[in-house]
Amino acid sequence: MKVRVRLAPSPTGSLHIGTARTALFNWLFAQRNKGSFLIRIEDTDKERSKDEFTSNILEGLQWLGLKWDEAPIIQSKRIHEHKEAIKSLINKGLAYRCFATEEELQTMRDAQINSGEAPRYDNRHRKLTKEQEQKFIKDGRSAVIRFRIEDEESVHWNDMVRGPIHWNSKDLGGDMVISRRAPANEIGDPLYNLVVVLDDAAMEITHVIRGEDHIANTAKQLLLYKALGFKEPSFAHTPLILNKDGRKLSKRDGVTSISDFKTMGYTSQAMTNYMTLLGWSPPEGMGEKFTLKESSSVFDFDRVNNAGAKFDWDKLQWLNSQEIHNWSNEKLLDSLIPLWTKEGWNLSSKDWGLKLVHLIKPSLILINDGIEESRVFFEEPLLKKDAIQQLEIPRAKEALKFICRKLEETPWHGKENEIAIELITSCSKSLDIKKGIIMKSLRAALLGTLQGPDLITSWGLLAMMENDQARIKRCL
């Protein structure tokens, strides 16, 4: 049996990290078992589904490196097949029209709650006579279609993550609605639990891998598999991603969409690396930093945890910084040029850009950090308090004047770093000023602060752009 798994997102929002982690686990499982990873866009919510969200989801998966093996299925294009299945269930006596109004159902639920019972449909219209149906139709009532769930049934499966799971059908809320309300002679839009079963069967899905919040749905869907005569897939219910308080991660916790992580400057490799660790434990000796290829060669559900996985920003940022630090200077430069362009900064030469990237790379956690780390090399900085104080100490400006005079006499000719060191040494010897004072004063004048990257390399970069003398002179 060839493994076939799927991701079935609803295009009602951008690709959420929870959905992306589900996609990742599906993809890894397919890769490990030489199977197929498929996409089904569940766009049956007509009001909220938008093409822009479908594009966002697919682009996000591509950015993460999670390529699908067949053309995506659009669920709404199968509505005819869905309605035909409902007709078949009605004809077999496994589904029926329920004419209960929303007001009647709410009154029923209120009474159950007041009696200390869990709200559930009481199956009141399961055995309507023809006369009763005709009266409801004459009264102009619309109807939903409900699937019969017998109270004495037991649902069970061996979950790939959680082991044996048993569910009493009496705890599933009564007969299940499988189509929206519509005029009595019509069938309304088919609903989630039914269409998922129909589509998974049509796509020959062998393993359904999704979040633990779908466990109750799985119990209902297994009853539908049985009624429809379909072979049941295997199920794996993965742990939810939690916030720092142990609640399900949501938009209220800040950034949760993959496109936002990308915009902030996270790398796709760091994202897939970190998401794999959200609920999965790597084998001993593998460590926490690995590629998609490495994790796909060892991924299995025996190492997926039951408990929720807390989102750890610090670990994600560490993985991201490690990934950036391992990039070649060329790759990082290619990522930074568009960001610099947005700031209005023009790169004079690739060689200069590569030297700048090499200088700032160790300081980067996010790709976007390259904007602020680079700013001082593109824009004349304001002097910070520590720089102003440094320039006010005795002999600081005397040293800078000496450096300025020497700069006018000394051609750099591509030897910026060597000449910078020679000038500092010459100044120290000629004026009998400690090198520490000279270097701090130069840093204050050139970079506007006493903090920052290596002074000699920074000075060399500014000299290549002929910006060093002007910055020193403004401080005299």
UniProtKB/Swiss-Prot annotation:
MF term (GO), any: ATP binding
Reaction equation(s) it catalyzes: tRNA(Glu) + L-glutamate + ATP = L-glutamyl-tRNA(Glu) + AMP + diphosphate
Q: Where is this motif: 'KMSKS' region?
A: 248-252
| Compartmental location | Cytoplasm
Q: What class of enzyme is it?
A: ligase
User: Could you mention a single GO BP entry for this protein?
Assistant: glutamyl-tRNA aminoacylation
Q: Does the keyword Protein biosynthesis apply?
A: yes
Q: For the motif 'HIGH' region, give the residue ranges.
A: 9-19
Tell me where on the tree of life, at the top rank, the source sits. Answer: Bacteria
Residues reported in the UniProt entry to bind ATP: 251
EC number(s) recorded for this UniProt protein: 6.1.1.17
Q: How does it assemble?
A: Monomer.
**What is the documented function of this protein?**
Catalyzes the attachment of glutamate to tRNA(Glu) in a two-step reaction: glutamate is first activated by ATP to form Glu-AMP and then transferred to the acceptor end of tRNA(Glu).
Q: What is this protein called?
A: Glutamate--tRNA ligase
Gene source species = Prochlorococcus marinus (strain SARG / CCMP1375 / SS120)
